[in-house]
From Swiss-Prot:
It catalyses: N-succinyl-(2S,6S)-2,6-diaminopimelate + H2O = (2S,6S)-2,6-diaminopimelate + succinate. PANTHER family: ACETYLORNITHINE DEACETYLASE (PTHR43808), N-ACETYL-L-CITRULLINE DEACETYLASE (PTHR43808:SF31). Catalyzes the hydrolysis of N-succinyl-L,L-diaminopimelic acid (SDAP), forming succinate and LL-2,6-diaminopimelate (DAP), an intermediate involved in the bacterial biosynthesis of lysine and meso-diaminopimelic acid, an essential component of bacterial cell walls. Zn(2+) 2 binds at D99, E134, H348. The active site is at D68, E133 (proton acceptor). Belongs to the peptidase M20A family. DapE subfamily. This is Succinyl-diaminopimelate desuccinylase. Its cofactor is Zn(2+); Co(2+). Binds 2 Zn(2+) or Co(2+) ions per subunit.
Length: 375
């Protein structure tokens, strides 16, 4: 017996949509949604394909996701070609199976079933889909959100289909995410010969005490919803490669994953104060890729918890751990945002896979969420 969720997932996997190339995935989704009465507005920007689709009026529940995937890596190490979906022992293998073509298929099939049962639903059901999430994320969801906000669109609830689960579907639901702030720091010195240090100024030596203090800072202790803010040095570089040249500059890149206990401005001020304390000559470049956001217990969280418990008989953990997602852009609209998707154990890995029955379960959960909020 065929399963529409599995079949649609397989159709999507067969399209090698390496970010930001959609490779025809959205055309499949659009065709299915239009067939059940959705109005679809393509919102393509540059090399990125996006669409906004809706059906009905009133309080709005949007489902958000991305059709793009990361590269497959060494295809010889896959048990089957990464863009040829294969089911083995109940597991569906293929790039994007878990992140996040399985979720997209579950969303669309859930919407089809929901509309069939509730053709005159009271609220508005919507989809926000992009092909630019895995790479730069510059022409995707963020641009669609900006356009929707500019024309006064209202979004009350948003379910993002990112693979949130840990062991079984729904055991972890993300009801927020930490902010992400990157600092590109250059410490300036004076290049010279290592045998004549008095004629040079080594930026590595000057910066070492400051960096030592930086990595030891306790930024906050987190709170009920967020773990403590963390700072990690990601890249550090100095020198010419020669063993007899004192470097002229030291380049350090570090990233903060910060909680709602801090703002990006508070972090910036503290870093600058530290640089001034050690009397360093420096250049700073900051990149804020996302503010922290949190969806407290309310109608959306309650609907998600109810759906998970109904079909999997477990109470999900509400967590804010992990990296950033497009939820950070959608939260700007004032919407309640929650992430619920398949198990994330193999995402971005060789032999990415998802339990086929989990996708069927996910479609039922998504449909129940629709029924609770916009039926």
């Amino acid at each position: 017996m065929s399963c529409p969720v599995i079949e649609l997932t397989q159709q999507l996997i067969r399209r090698p949509s390496l970010s930001p190339d959609d490779a025809g995935c959205q055309a499949l989704l659009i065709e299915r949604l239009q067939a059940v009465g959705f109005t679809v507005e393509p919102m393509n920007i540059g090399d990125t394909q996006n669409f906004w689709a809706w059906r009905g009026t009133g309080e709005t529940l949007a489902f958000a996701g991305h059709t793009d995937v990361v590269p497959a890596g060494d295809v010889e190490r896959w048990i089957n070609p990464p863009f040829e979906p294969t089911i083995r022992d109940g597991m569906l293998f293929g790039r994007g199976a878990a992140d996040m073509k399985g979720s997209l298929a579950a969303m669309v099939v859930a919407a089809e079933r929901f509309v069939a049962q509730h053709p005159h639903h009271r609220g508005r059901l919507a989809f926000l889909i992009t092909s630019d999430e895995e790479a730069s994320a510059t022409n995707g969801t963020v641009k669609v959100v900006e356009a929707l906000m500019a024309r006064g669109e209202r979004l009350d609830y948003c379910l993002v289909g990112e693979p949130s689960s840990s062991e079984v579907v729904g055991d972890v639901v993300k009801n927020g995410r930490r902010g992400s702030l990157t600092c590109n720091l250059t410490i300036h010195g004076v290049q010279g010969h290592v045998a004549y240090p008095h004629l040079a100024d080594n930026p590595v030596h000057r910066a070492a005490p400051m960096l030592n203090e930086l990595v030891g800072i306790e930024w906050d202790r987190g709170n009920e919803f967020f773990p403590p803010t963390s700072m990690q040095i990601a890249n550090i570089q100095a020198g010419t490669g020669s063993n007899n040249v004192i470097p002229g500059d030291l380049h350090v890149q570090f990233n903060f994953r910060f909680s709602t206990e801090l703002t990006d401005e508070m972090i910036k001020q503290r870093v600058v104060a530290l640089l001034e304390k050690y009397q360093l000559r420096y250049t700073l470049d900051w990149w804020l890729s996302g503010q922290p956001f949190l969806t407290a217990r309310g109608k959306l969280v309650d609907a998600v918890v109810n759906a998970v418990h109904h079909y999997n008989e477990i109470k999900p953990q509400l967590l804010t751990t992990g990296g950033t997602s497009d939820g950070r852009f959608i939260a700007r609209m004032g919407a309640q945002v929650v992430e619920l998707g398949p198990v994330n154990a193999t995402i971005h890995k060789i032999n990415e896979c998802v339990k086929a029955s989990d996708l069927q379960l996910l479609a039922r959960m998504y449909q129940r969420i629709m029924e609770q909020l916009v039926a």
